[in-house]
C-alpha cells in the first residue's frame, strides 16, 4: 500500500465517538475514550488513526465486539448489525474534549 492509501484507510477507521453514560463514567475513572470503529479495524490501526486525527499520544487500545440486537416489528424479526467499540487510553497529560469541538 502506498502512504496515501494508508492514510485514507486510517481516516476511515474511526466512525464516531461513543458518548454514553457508561463511556463518560469510564472516561472519568480510567481516562479512556470510547469510539465506534470499523468491524475490520485492528488495534494498531485504531491507535494510528486516533493519533493522526486528534494529534494525541495513545497508551493502549482495548477492543469490544458488540453483537447486534434482535428486534421485532409485528410478526417479523430483524437483526441490527454487529459493530466494534474501541476504548483508547491516552498517555498522561493528553486529552480529547468532544464538548469543545476539538
Swiss-Prot record:
Family to which the UniProt record says this protein belongs? Belongs to the universal ribosomal protein uL23 family.
Q: How does it assemble?
A: Part of the 50S ribosomal subunit. Contacts protein L29, and trigger factor when it is bound to the ribosome.
Protein name listed in UniProt: Large ribosomal subunit protein uL23
Which cellular components does GO assign to this protein? ribonucleoprotein complex; ribosome
Q: What does this protein do?
A: One of the early assembly proteins it binds 23S rRNA. One of the proteins that surrounds the polypeptide exit tunnel on the outside of the ribosome. Forms the main docking site for trigger factor binding to the ribosome.
Lineage, top ranks: Bacteria, Pseudomonadati, Pseudomonadota, Betaproteobacteria, Nitrosomonadales
**Example GO BP:** translation
Which Pfam families did the record assign?
Ribosomal_L23
Q: Which domain of life is it from?
A: Bacteria
Q: Which UniProt keywords apply?
A: Ribonucleoprotein, Ribosomal protein, RNA-binding, rRNA-binding
Can you provide one Gene Ontology molecular function annotated for this UniProt record? rRNA binding
Amino acid at each position: 500500500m502506498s502512504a496515501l492509501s494508508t492514510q485514507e484507510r486510517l481516516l476511515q477507521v474511526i466512525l464516531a465517538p461513543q458518548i454514553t453514560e457508561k463511556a463518560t463514567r469510564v472516561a472519568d475513572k480510567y481516562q479512556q475514550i470510547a469510539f465506534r470503529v470499523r468491524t475490520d479495524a485492528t488495534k494498531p490501526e485504531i491507535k494510528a488513526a486516533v493519533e493522526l486525527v486528534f494529534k494525541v499520544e495513545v497508551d493502549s487500545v482495548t477492543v469490544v465486539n458488540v453483537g447486534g440486537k434482535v428486534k421485532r416489528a409485528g410478526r417479523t424479526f430483524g437483526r441490527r448489525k454487529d459493530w466494534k467499540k474501541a476504548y483508547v487510553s491516552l498517555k498522561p497529560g493528553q486529552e480529547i474534549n468532544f464538548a469543545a469541538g476539538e
